[in-house]
Every structure is written in C-alpha cells, then in structure tokens.
Amino acid sequence: MSDNVPTIAAVATAPGRGGVGVIRISGKNLLPMAQALCGKTPKPRVATYADFTDADGQAIDSGLLLFFAAPASFTGEDVIELQGHGGPVVMDMLLNRCLELGARLAEPGEFTKRAFLNDKLDLAQAEGVADLIDASSRSAARLALRSLKGDFSRRIHGLVEDLITLRMLVEATLDFPEEDIDFLEAADARGKLDGLRRAVDDVLANAQQGAILREGLNVVLVGAPNVGKSSLLNALAGDEVAIVTDIAGTTRDAVRERILIDGVPVHIVDTAGLRETDDVVERIGIERSRKAVSEADVALVLVDPREGLNEKTRAILDALPSELKRIEIHSKSDLHAHAAGGFGTGAETVIALSAKTGDGLDALKRTLLREAGWQGEGEGLFLARTRHVNALKAAQEELSLAALCGNHQIELFAEHLRLAQVACGEITGEFTADDLLGVIFSRFCIGK
C-alpha cells in the first residue's frame, strides 16, 4: 500500500449494549495517538489497563489498551484496540475522540481490505472473514473457517503452480519451431494437462458444494389460489408466517421465509396467486411474485388432486420459465387419496403432502436437497461463492480448449493455459479488477 494511507477507526463490536465494546484503529505510527488517548505508551501485544480521556483530560471510560505493531497485526499496519464498556454512548464518545486525533471513520470492510492489500490475507481468505461472520448454520461456520485459514486458497495456489510449470514447459518449446516434432507429446504436455483438468474438476466440485451451503436454494410456491401454498410455507417454517384462510387471494404479497435443511439455507417465497386482478395492491404483490419466480431455482407446484390441472393452474404453469425445475405437490393428502402419477406439470418428482399432519414433509426436504445438488458435508469442503464457481468453470473451459489444440498449435495451447491461470488468480485476488474489490469489501460490516 502507499505510504500516504490515512488512519482509520471504527467500532468493531456489534451495535447495541453489551458488557464489552471495542474500538479498532489502524494506520501508521499510532503510538502518539495512544499517548494522547490514554497517557501511556503501550508495549506491543501486552494488555494495558488505562483511562481513555477526552481533549481536556477527562475520563470517557476505562478499560484495556492493546497495541499491535506493524507488520505483525491483522491489517499489517499499526493497530490499536480500545476495549471498554459496551454502551452505545460510550462507544460513540470514544470513536469521536479517535476522529479528533486524526483518524477517519473506516468504510465497511476497510480493515480486511487493508489486510488483503498488505498481503496478510488473499481475497478468498478475506471473503472467508465475512462468511464466518454471516454464517447461518454450524456447517457454514465450519467451512467458512476453513476458507479463512487458507484451505481453499491452498487448493487454488496448487492449481496455479501446476499451470505455471506447464506453461514454462510449453513456452520453452516455442524456441524450436521445427514442424516435424510434436513437442506437446514429447514433453508429455497433454498428460500433464489431463492431470490439471482432473484437479480443476475436483476443486470445482468442492466449490459448488460450498456455494450451495453459502448461497442456498431459492424456492417458489406456485399454484391456484387457496390450494394450500401458505399452509405449506408455515409447515416448512414451523411457524405461522403466512395467513391461512378459505378465502382465495388472502396472500396479496409475496411472503418470504428462510429455513435450514441439513444446514443448507432454503429461501422460500409464497407467491401471491399468479392471476389477473383489478385490485391495485394485489397486483403489486403479483408482480413481486413474478420477479421471485424469475430468480428461483425450484418451483413447488401445488395441485389439488380432486381438481387436477384446472384453468388457473395451467395459466400459472404457462408463466413459469421452461427451464425452471419443478416438484409437483399433491396438497391436502389428509383429506383425500393421493392420485397416481402426476398431472403433466413438467415435474420429474411428485409428492403427496399434508401440511396439517406433516406427512410428506421429510420427503419434500430430501428432494429439495437433491435438487440443490447437496451431497452432505465431507472432508475437503470449504465455503465458496458464485464468483469462485464461475472462475473455476472459466478455467475448466480454457483447459478443455487447450486439449482440443492440434499438435503444432503450441502458441494457442499456451494462451489457453495463461487464461486458465488468470481465471484461478481472480479467486485469490492475484488478477482482480479494483471495482470488484470495491463490491466485495463494501458488503462487510463496519469495523471488520
């Protein structure tokens, strides 16, 4: 980083009242600030009890002062932490005192961004920090910690090293352009490429599992009005999150709920019945439902077996994207016998279900996990993001194109290897545009 880097400060603990609150400060040459704040010059990595004072020397609070000298700190800069009492007024007064002494308020994720720019973390590890904080299940927390500790990064660095080795081998042959020699075969470049492709496939498979655990599955409930969508949402959520009546059109807006199935987040939207209406409020809800459908991974199509595919249900099915996965749900199975087979909804799976008794719920949950592609938490998994999966797919594609190169297309072969390396480097931040960094770190909380 540049030498002309401002000192930043922020409250590092969650908003609200608590037993302890922490102010984090990062910058260069922070000992004078510590002296002004506490009247003491702290020793590195030693907790010092002190009064935190204002400009007039009046005590604001008292607590622990910790100093981490550069480069042995989280950000790679001098870092001070003030651990005081966790009241919002006290934290605000302490933070304002830091700003008076020359710090500026940190932007979201700026501490972690500085750690990345100072080579304390790579980009995948930095994202692991945010994912650990945002983890919605124990499985997600465990896998995020693996990413933070560098498990994912080490896999990527291994791929990059193998790519560099193969590139050096192939590019060295460009100095010998004799047409009667197959350098790709002579150097076993194709054999090494096959090994690389298998390694990328393995990392990609793990990343896809990690992305499922982080991103989850988007599910919409669709069906004719009063077919039982809200009852099913309540049954899945284990709570009364949607109003249930016998009146068609009770759900006038899309109702959203998030549940966990085997640690995998499932985002469920109970759509307002997709139909034409003169009601202005209901029409807005229906438009929101259509948007939810366009973003869904799976549609649960509820059908009353006594009625089958009536005109309203057919109209709803016609409005669904043709590529959207569908699971056909025969609702209210406690009231009538399950119809054999499906009703031609385009679903590969048909489940008879009673939201009232719970029959069929476990089968539905298992089916949702299968549709998500979740294979269960195993060894070697790490939390990943969609951008990681896309980068690995790009690398996979470049290696596939390299495999198609003819025996004497060495320059093209080498170029595909280079592009595969660039794709892998985007994951760890070796090749990453500044605007992408801005997006990634802006989603962190302030103080991290």
UniProtKB/Swiss-Prot annotation:
Positions of Mg(2+) binding: 230, 251
Cofactor mode of binding and number, as noted: Binds 1 potassium ion per subunit.
Domain TrmE-type G: 216-373
Binding positions for (6S)-5-formyl-5,6,7,8-tetrahydrofolate per the UniProt entry: 24, 81, 120, 448
A single BP term in Gene Ontology: tRNA wobble uridine modification
Co-factor requirement: K(+)
Binding site for K(+): 226, 245, 247, 250
Localization per record: Cytoplasm
EC number annotated for this UniProt entry: 3.6.-.-
Molecular function, one GO term: GTP binding
Main localisation: cytoplasm
Coiled-coil residue spans: none
Protein residues bound to GTP: 226-231, 245-251, 270-273
Superkingdom of origin organism: Bacteria
UniProt entry keywords in alphabetical sequence: Cytoplasm, GTP-binding, Hydrolase, Magnesium, Metal-binding, Nucleotide-binding, Potassium, tRNA processing
GO CC list: cytosol
InterPro entries: G_TrmE (IPR031168), GTP-bd (IPR006073), GTP-bd_TrmE_N (IPR018948), GTPase_MnmE (IPR004520), MnmE_dom2 (IPR027368), MnmE_helical (IPR025867), P-loop_NTPase (IPR027417), Small_GTP-bd (IPR005225)
One Pfam family in the UniProt entry: MMR_HSR1
Record's function text: Exhibits a very high intrinsic GTPase hydrolysis rate. Involved in the addition of a carboxymethylaminomethyl (cmnm) group at the wobble position (U34) of certain tRNAs, forming tRNA-cmnm(5)s(2)U34.
PANTHER family linked to this entry: TRNA MODIFICATION GTPASE GTPBP3, TRNA MODIFICATION GTPASE GTPBP3, MITOCHONDRIAL
Summary of subunit composition and partner proteins: Homodimer. Heterotetramer of two MnmE and two MnmG subunits.
Family from the record: Belongs to the TRAFAC class TrmE-Era-EngA-EngB-Septin-like GTPase superfamily. TrmE GTPase family.
Protein name: tRNA modification GTPase MnmE
Source organism of this protein record: Neisseria meningitidis serogroup C (strain 053442)
Gene field: mnmE
